């Protein structure tokens, strides 16, 4: 039985950047070769890790991961979500911020339109479970060591 070789057809996509937006940040083209992950029917191949709203508005990433080393505040999540043209994953706790506070922040982030919430290590497993039970969006947990 002979195997048929599949050739990948190269697509030409028209592109327009405009004069004022020609200085936006572009991710490397090789990102398009990644498989990515599909969440709620949207395929995400790239994440920009930033809380800078100017970068959020001027980068061609498929999603934004907005995590910062301070106590999460709904007003910051709302500002980033309202500026972004793409899905946003917002930080809702870890370390100092945990328990019911992280749970309420996650619920509020979901109501604000976040695509997912992020918990930074260290975070107790029971808090992760509690948040997962209360929201219907992805819960991402950072891992810093094999034992966590």
Which sequence ranges carry the predicted segments?
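Glycine/small-residue-rich loop that forms an oxyanion/phosphate-binding "nest" at active or ligand-binding sites
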Residues: 88-91, 97-119
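N-terminal amphipathic alpha-helix/helix-capping segment at the start of soluble metabolic enzymes
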Residues: 2-48, 77
């Amino acid at each position: 039985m002979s195997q048929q070789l599949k050739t990948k057809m190269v697509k030409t996509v028209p592109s327009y950047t405009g004069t004022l937006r020609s200085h936006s940040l572009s991710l490397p083209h090789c990102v398009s070769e990644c498989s990515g992950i599909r969440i709620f029917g949207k395929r995400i191949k790239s994440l920009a890790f930033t809380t800078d709203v100017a970068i959020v508005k001027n980068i061609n990433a498929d999603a934004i991961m907005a995590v910062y080393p301070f106590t999460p505040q709904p007003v910051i999540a709302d500002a980033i979500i309202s500026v972004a043209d793409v899905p946003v994953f917002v930080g809702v706790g870890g370390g100092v911020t945990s328990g019911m506070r992280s749970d309420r922040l996650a619920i509020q982030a979901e109501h604000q339109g976040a695509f997912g919430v992020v918990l930074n290590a260290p975070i107790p497993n029971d808090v992760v479970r509690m948040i997962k039970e209360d929201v219907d969006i992805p819960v991402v947990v950072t891992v810093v060591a094999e034992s966590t």
